[in-house]
Amino acid sequence: MGIKLTKKQRRYLRDNFQQKSDVQLAKHLGVKESYIRKALQQLKLKRTEEDLKELQKIEVRQGKKIEKRAALKAHFSRKTLFILSIIIAVFISLLVFYHFFGRYFLPKESQYIATLHKQLAPLKASELNILFFTLDTTRADHLGCYGYDKIETPNIDKLAQNGIMFQNATSQAPLTLPSHSSIFTGTYPLYHGVRDNGGFYLEPDKTTLAEILKENGWATSAFIGAFVLDSRWGLDQGFDYYYDNFDLAKYKTISLDSVQREGGEVIAPFFKWLDKNYQKKFFSWIHLYDAHTPYDPPEPYKTRYANGMWGLYDGEIAYVDFLIGKVLDNLKEKKIAEKTIIVIVADHGESLGQHRESGHGFFVYDATTLVPLIIQLPSQQLQGKVISDQVEIIDVMPTLLQVLNISVPQDIQGKSLVSLIMGDNTENEQYAYSESLYPRYHYGWSELHSLRNSKYKYIKAPKPELYDIIADPRETTNIYNNNTSIAQEFEQKLKDLMEKSSAKGIEEKGPRKLDEESMQKLMALGYIGGFTSSSKLKKGEKLADPKDKIELFNKIKLAEWKSADEQLDGALEQITQVIEQDPAIMEARQVRGRIFIKQNKLEEAIAEFKEALNVDPDYESAIFSLAEAYKKAKKYDEAIAGFKRLMQMDARDSKPPFNLGDIYLELKDIDKAIPYLQKSIQIDPEHSAMAHNLLGAAYIEKKNLTQAEHEINEALKIRPRIPDAYHNLALICEAKGEFTKAIEQYKKEIELHPAAYPTHFNLALLYRNMGMKDEQIPHLEEAIKYKKDFAKGYLFLAKAYLDLNKNLEQAINLAEEGLTLEPESEYSPLGHYILADIYNRLGRTNEANREFQKGRSLEEKIKKSSQ
């Protein structure tokens, strides 16, 4: 078993193992020396030869000091007692002096903190609540308090009037997950390692604001508006309650952008949680995603802000303001508003057409990185403050910790804003860092890094940029070439910041090594185009400047939007134009492949995903898409290889083992299906309803009905409306001979999912077997209504009409349709025999004989082929 270490212990060992001996480390942590040795092995912390030599020197010096101290103690024991008594008397005098006058001699920052805490009186800092709003995709210059006159945001404006508003707050990334990771760890993406949405995780060794507050006695909760911040990505660390609960089944397509909930659905569970917890001190985070596309605010905001697309964007922000007002009113009703810190901050903005970018994520201009930041503290002296100094969103966490009188961890890279809040303007010019790796990860173009202060903005790109943001706030005129000295200063500062802020020992996400045999097999199936990731090869080379590719980027986005709107022909035409201009854009290949999937052109889709992997063999999204396409095409060996590769690449993704379990279940290899489904559940228990349901189906095949029922009920606990669960419970009832209960379960499935054609079919067969032949007809009709190519459904409906001796001409048409759809399936002989019987009844003997012979011949053929 591994050594169990707390985060603080791990951090202490990492920071001190080179400078301190095992004895010193053990003494500090209060553990045995052997425990330290095992812990260092577990954390893979190894001292160099230099470290060991230095530790030996320290131990020698300490040994000499001990000997000298003993000699001195023997010689000067009386004198020592006399001196000690004087020291104690002086110390007591100093304590008395400090009690009355000490705050005037503290370091400046400590003075500010002490003054702030005095202003908060009679409230104690350690008893304040924190209500933390993150407003997704919200520009600072689209709020009333920031000078925008085309919108009404009275609640946010009032918070600014009663609090502190920062005019130059910069986000560290124009993407939701990296930005929120920075907000809640107080560190740069360079350090916490979350560089893009999806496929990145906030690692457990990173300390979050919620974790610190929970350790200090706060009840913690979070209420999330979009799947991009689902708990699976790691931001739930430290939260007692993390409300994500996204029902993925109700979305036609699942993407990080499309799975979202309206803000009213976010604050409703917050109100329920607060009703039970408002008498405790609490930290609650509310994430409002409404300002993100699509811009579709509810009434009256849709009508009030109907002036084009950007007007509807404002309408979404106005609606968010309304929701914030509802939350604040709830605090007042509970009489806790006066002891609650309110934070308003956006993760990033929205370009709205500036620099030819409509959304966000691609560029790092102020349109997407300059965000609102408002902090309202329960102090009248701090109302209405406006701070124009450059700050960063990573500064919020250390600021709150200082306000709450909690020590700030050493690895926090943000700076507390308490000094600025208390009026200190003597600090040196501050700089803010932003980055976007999105162009490189998705398109193979250059990443972007920027550095900003209150006067200039520098963007590191293949064609570097410098802007005078006072004279040119919309960054329209690049002054880089005419201001080389300023540009060089920013370049050096950016380089220094990136080197200093990067986490040591953490490499950027890259390919996982495979053995030679596995590599060759995967290459043969199209999963690997070469032995090195092209994204790795390109690092450091001159990649395309995103500025020069914005038109192609916009065409790709337009194709994605058309595809989402089921305008497949238009989407295909658009994305084909992009590929003709630049065949190496892996994301374009992905988009075209997904369009082919929707058109059921599986071979074309497979070819596209292979092309994407030729560009970047380690592009996980393309590997998944290729495996999924193989699965849809029933090329199961190829699909299995892909999903196994994905399990090696990302052991925390539950989708690959789920798909492997599904495939093996389809192949009736139940013993292989079960462990993969169990693995999927283990990885992501909160979203494991489908895996539990499939596991139930697997146990039905194994005749383990008790375990099957348990798994299906687990699925229903997680998702009460999950498809196929009641269908599977009906199968269990049938296996037990409980046919009446089986009918009830089938009917429940149909009530929840009227288009469930297999359930209609099974219920029809059950009615038939119970002698209720009339009842089977409507369900067989529903089965072929919802599944137009369901050959077996046509044949059994024809047989039902034959058995009832009615609609015989229609029965002929049904049988012929079933045979056309599947001329040589195991049920096809039945179709010919049905036709033979009908023709006999109609007196058409020759046709009857012909169909009978066809049925017998086909039956023999199928029998031989199965031997």
Region locations from a protein language model:
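Canonical positions in the second alpha-helix
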Residues: 578, 611-612, 645-646, 679-680, ...
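Register position in tetratricopeptide repeats
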Residues: 564, 598, 632-633, 666-667, ...
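Structural marker of alpha-solenoid helical repeat scaffolds
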Residues: 581, 615, 649, 683-684, ...
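Catalytic domains that recognize anionic headgroups
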Residues: 82, 88-594, 598-602, 607, ...
